[in-house]
Amino acid sequence: MLAGMPSLSHEEQQEAVERIHKFMSEGMSSGEAIALVAAEIRERHQNDPQAMAIFEDHDFDEHTESDYRRDDEPDADDIEDLYEG
């Protein structure tokens, strides 16, 4: 879930970690704290031209496994293990 996360300076990373720890010390779960801080960072860097473009999981929902391999590529189950005794 790093879609659209910008590259952060060391100082920005430290600030993010401190905010996450602060939220957790107040009783928030680590997942919630990370999600909240990530959303804040995305909002601050919304129009940042250096923000990395990373694909979301749903970008691949319309594709099947066969879309990502060649037709002549064998299934893992069909490959005989040549190194077995």
From Swiss-Prot:
Residues 57-72 have a biased composition (Basic and acidic residues). It comes from Yersinia pseudotuberculosis serotype IB (strain PB1/+). Residues 73-85 have a biased composition (Acidic residues). InterPro entries: UPF0181. Residues 57-85 are annotated as: Disordered. HAMAP family: UPF0181 (MF_00507). Pfam families: UPF0181 (PF03701). Belongs to the UPF0181 family. This is UPF0181 protein YPTS_1774.
